Amino acid sequence: MKDTPPTARDRRRRSGRVTSLLLAVLTLLATVGLTTGPAFAAPHAGTAPTVSAAIPQVPDNAVDAVAAMQPSWNLGNSLDAIPDETSWGNPPATKALFDTIRAQGFRSVRIPVTWSNHQSATAPYTIDPTSLNRVRQVVDWALADGLYVILNIHHDSWQWINKMATDHDQVLARYNATWTQIATKFKDEPRRLLFESVNEPVFDNADDTRKAQLLDELNTSFHTVVRQTGGGNATRLLVLPTQACTPEQNLMDNLAATMSSLHDPNLVATVHYYSFWPFSVNIAGYTRFDATVQQDMSDTFARMHDTFVAKGIPVYLGEYGLLSYPDYTHQDYVRRGEALKYFEALGHEARINGVTTALWDAGSFLNRNTLQWRDPGLFAQIKSSWTTRSGTASSDSVFVPKAGAIEARTLTLNPNGTTFRGLWQGTTRLTEGSDYTVSGDQVTLTASALTRLTGDRAYGINATLQARFSQGVPWEIKVITYDTPVLSDATGTTGSFALPAQFRGDMLATMEAKYADGSNAGPANWTSYQQFGTAFSPDYAGKAITLTPDFFTAVNDGAPVTLTFHFWSGATVTYHVTKSGSSVTGTNS
């Protein structure tokens, strides 16, 4: 689950996974140094597109059925919201929403549901009939569009299921009662409806062995309860997760053992993937989709394939995305171009490994009020990745200094199996030789072309180019005029501190924080590179960089901290802050 607000809930949901990922990161950092087109049309606002009424026939074989579900989409932050469907900022789901999803090429939807706020917490754990009927209505809308639907128990996982180790009998009784009611309500629905036992299951006060036992018990009990309700549930596809839906090898091995013990051909494995954690949240200097991040992705998908797919067990990647991108409520924490590379590569890895993927959308991709994609170019990249590769480049920007002679700039192309066809500005093709040159995988914009493209060299984006390839989505390149940013002295408090910043066309990539002795300062004391958004955040319109209360809570009183701000142009700017009680002073000298 990767959500838009509330962010506090995001941290609570991810705490177990972040801990395990952090340990892996610390191990990695001990040995690896830090490194720093044609669009798909969006539907018109408020208008449901025409959708074919053709209803797909579900293949008998589970592998073929799950393959037919590709691609998939999550109705996130809706029926899973707490306490009610609209509590987290999305409007109520409508039939028009599913019409849109179907028209945009999706073949299945995952409908997360949190039941606890609409259910008695004591026996017989009755689910409110009105809430159950509302879920049925939403499911039926999706089914009517010919979509496959995955229905689950969602945030209940950390509300009460997580207490199973210390309150075993009551948790299991409530879990079984919950699934008995759900399964009975939906037992006559078509086979295009799948049940998922529980989202991202976690267990408090238990060691790893006990956690594995508890999840095995839950998944096994889920299987028994659903099958015993009869009707379509006798052969319905059932989706079983690993602990926290994490795709680590030992956790997938545990799940494979559970599935083997059930002797049921109608089972589906599910995990989630939000990339290499430091890249996903922009911490520890992982600002780019670099070799380490790429390797994490390819290794993860290979594990899914080897553990399940190669053995005839289908995998449904129930959620994927990045933990901090996109989020329309604040500045991008991950660079858009680097995120585009991530989504392009993920589509490729899913295809070659036979994994069906479900985009986690809490409202930051599709605006559910207008039924339009918030970033059509981002969705175009995702949609293209379902069927083909796209070329990219080392950067989505070329930075040109404000003053002085303009010099040629070079980017490295990443064709990804395609062939580079040239550079365009709108409908105008640039001329190879005079505007740009190509040498191997290097494309160089000439000084004369950049002089023309930057015009009067006003700060910011002066021109947008496209690198076009033989297939896939063109790669956009922004030509940007900049100067090294200027930061000014400031005073404030630990609860409110913003240093004045003249960004001068540049954009912030990351921030380092160190004490005078060279040791790390800030919340992430295992790295000098602090987490974007958690420790600091730029305000381009307000011409400031904010240092958060969380940052100052972790800073030693009276100890000067040297901040190094890294910008996407390659420029770095040093700044100094000192906390004295609740007061903070900042200086650029």
Tell where the protein language model's regions lie, with residue ranges.
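Secretory targeting and sorting signals
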Residues: 1-43
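Acidic/histidine-rich helix-loop elements
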Residues: 75-93, 121-127, 166-167, 278-294
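Active-site region of glycoside hydrolase catalytic domains
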Residues: 173-286, 291-293, 303-323, 353
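Aromatic-rich peripheral "rim/lid" segments of glycoside hydrolase catalytic domains that contact
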Residues: 328-428, 434, 440-444, 454-476, ...
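Extracellular/luminal ectodomains and secreted, surface-exposed scaffolds of diverse proteins
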Residues: 429-446, 530-541
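Edge beta-strands of extracellular beta-sandwich domains
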Residues: 472-483, 571-588
